From Swiss-Prot:
Protein name: Large ribosomal subunit protein bL33
UniProt family annotation: Belongs to the bacterial ribosomal protein bL33 family.
Gene3D superfamilies in the cross-refs: Ribosomal protein L33
An annotated Gene Ontology molecular function: structural constituent of ribosome
Source organism of this protein record: Mycobacterium leprae (strain TN)
Keywords: Ribonucleoprotein, Ribosomal protein
GO BP field: translation
Amino acid sequence: MASSTDVRPKITMACEVCKHRNYITKKNRRNDPDRMELKKFCRNCGKHQSHRETR
């Protein structure tokens, strides 16, 4: 089981427009300590939207 201080935790990316959680990815906490934000395709909206890391 993964510990809470894992260097590469799994994170969920949610669309900022419709709030759907579309993507699951990993990130390195040492290189990116703050929340990740990427432009990805949202299937619910049907276009590229900004996706932000959720907790």
